[in-house]
Amino acid sequence: MTAYSDKTNQNDNTNSKQDTGVEDWMTEIWDWIDNHNIAGSYDSSVPREPEALRQLERLDLGYGKSTSYSYIDNKSVLQSESESTEPLPSAIGHLKNLKYLRLRGFNELPEQIAQLHSLETLVYMKCSFTEFPKVLCKLKNLKSLKILSKSLESFPNEFGNLSSLTHFDMRGTQVQELPDSIGNLSKITSIELYANEALKALPESIGNLTKLEKLEIRASDLKTLPSSIGNLKQLKSLGLYHNGLQSLPDSITNLKALEQLDVSETLLSGVSESVSRFLGNVGSKVTW
């Protein structure tokens, strides 16, 4: 790909590398991208200087069938779009300015990925792990996590260590329950859970998320809500569309900030008198 990673140029001496500002970790990443690409798919717009990685803020891996380098909103963006059969290089931990990372189709991740201290957004797609990787739970500055994975079945307790998380979006998984440690995510304001057909319940610890404003649970096997949901005093939108929900807890009447409630296509067979009055007060904001 570049003179720094081309095997025909491996005789360049160390002084030459120092003069150009190229470090070994840069070459390691570009070598990986070279091997990762489908033959003939490489885009000539990708810069030939590995040192450009110093400023990289967005990395899309496994998006399509080509590689490109561009600027989006004045941010350095690298897209290596073919799905990978090779593990990420450990050198990825050197991308100190990386704020956005998209992973697709991986079955192995290096421990060094936890060194991405500037990472704010992670998109996790079609990776083959059955448990969410613990190493990703070390991303203490992560603010947004989006998961789309049919293979995923569970989360480790370490999930609660994502202390900066404000938005969590999970779709199409086989997860049956969220970990109790989700209650440690004190900054979270939005949770969206779509088409997780095996999801049966929410942990009581969900009530600890006092900054939560939006909770959407659609197309799951959810049958009840924890009574602690009444602690979500900032909750404005509660979507429970197309679930197996059979009842609503009395504590739902404590949701004074609620502006929108969707309980359409559920199995609600009856609610208590207090819940009925509450729904009446919410009025047109309720979708049945």
Residues covered by each model-derived region:
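Terminal targeting and flexible regions in eukaryotic proteins, enriched
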Residues: 1-31
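Intrinsically disordered, low-complexity segments used as extracellular stalks/linkers
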Residues: 13-16, 99, 117, 130, ...
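LRR N-terminal entry segment and analogous cap-like coil->beta motifs
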Residues: 23-105, 120
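The feature encodes a structural signal of leucine-rich repeats
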Residues: 46-47, 88-90, 109-113, 132-134, ...
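Leucine-rich repeat
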Residues: 53, 94-97, 106, 115-119, ...
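Conserved hydrophobic beta-strand positions in leucine-rich repeat
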Residues: 59-61, 98-103, 120-125, 142-147, ...
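Conserved "Asn-ladder"/turn position within leucine-rich repeats
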Residues: 64, 82-83, 104-106, 127, ...
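Leucine-rich solenoid repeat scaffolds
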Residues: 248-288
